[in-house]
Every structure is written in C-alpha cells, then in structure tokens.
C-alpha cells in the first residue's frame, strides 16, 4: 500500500527525497576532497618499508604541528652551518606537505635511486625547546623504501614518523621521514643518521650536532 497524504512513508522509487537532494552539495564536496588527496603521515614504531597506498595506521597526529613551525624553501643559505646548501629555514606557520593526487603506475619505468637530504633542527625550533630532524627523499622508483634513523650508529625508533611516498610530475616518487627529539637529546649525541634502503641500494646521510652550533 502507498501511504496516503499526511502519513509518514517511503519516497516513490527512483525519486530522491528532499533530505538527499539537500545533501548533494556535501557529497560532491567530499568527493572532491577525496579525489584531490592529502598525505597522511604515519607513526613508525619501527623501521619499515613504505609504498604508495600503504595503510596509514591508526595515528592521525598531523605533522603540521611538528613541521609547521618553519618552512623549507630554496634560497640563500641562512640555516645552521651544517644545513645543505641551497636551502634556508623560514619561520612560518604554513605547513610544507607533499601533495599526492592520483597515482599512476608505470611498469616499464627503470629503477631510480632516491636523492636524500638530511636537515638538522632549525635555530628557531631549538629556541622553542623542540628539535626535529627531517630526511627528504626525492626522485626514486619504484615507490617502496625503508628508512632507519640512527643515533651514534645505533638504530632508534622512538619519535619517528614517515609520510607515504607520493608521485611526482616526473613519475618518480618523493617521501619524508621525521625524527622528533628534545634539544637535550639532540645535543647529547655525536651524530644522527638517516639510512634509506631502496631496491638493494643504501643511501645514508649523517649530521653532527657539534657542527651545527
């Protein structure tokens, strides 16, 4: 039986109800956000391999609060003495996040070893009683690698976070790993290293706190 006028009943088949019609703009907005895609950092309790589409885990703590204190950008060399040349630290609340977008797999593409750059904590961050080391990995293929952080040559896992590799415009991948310390922990060791293993090859970058003062 079809409900009569004034009765609470079902909508006619094939006709969207008023509530659904009102929700269409929200549904379309949600679809646009999902299609665009955002990198979600994953907390790493141990060194592990990550690839495109790897599960993000239960951690939803954003790196915006950790790395939004200053923005990495190319320019004059104004960071600590041990910073890679061509980069500077700019104090900014804007977050530096790699965009992911739609991923395209190219099966016939040759392997490419990642270019690795290790950044020590900035002076602004140390003054705020925080210390974050950043390991940037660019131009690698395929998009699966393993990152291991070391303090004086000993692997460490506490305070490590990793982003999921994202496709670059050249069809290679980029990713970043973060090691969060206190200024006291940063100064108490002779060296910190970021070791990246990719397709049987290993790239390791090391920074010495004593050279950054």
UniProtKB/Swiss-Prot annotation:
GO terms for molecular function: antigen binding. Residues 1-37 form the signal peptide. Critical for B-cell development. Pfam families: C1-set (PF07654). It is linked to Agammaglobulinemia 2, autosomal recessive: A primary immunodeficiency characterized by profoundly low or absent serum antibodies and low or absent circulating B cells due to an early block of B-cell development. Affected individuals develop severe infections in the first years of life. Keywords: Disease variant, Disulfide bond, Endoplasmic reticulum, Immunoglobulin domain, Secreted, Signal. GO terms for cellular component: endoplasmic reticulum; extracellular region; IgG immunoglobulin complex; membrane. Residues 114-208 form the Ig-like C1-type domain. This is Immunoglobulin lambda-like polypeptide 1. Expressed only in pre-B-cells and a special B-cell line (which is surface Ig negative). It is found in: Endoplasmic reticulum; Secreted. Associates non-covalently with VPREB1. Interacts with SYNV1/HRD1 (via N-terminus); this interaction leads to increased IGLL1 ubiquitination and degradation in pre-B cells, possibly through a lysosomal, not proteasomal, pathway. One of its GO terms (biological process) is immunoglobulin mediated immune response. InterPro entries: Ig-like_dom, Ig-like_dom_sf, Ig-like_fold, Ig/MHC_CS, Ig_C1-set, MHC/Immunoglobulin. Disulfide bonds join 135-194. Residues 97-108 are annotated as: J region. Residues 109-213 are annotated as: C region.
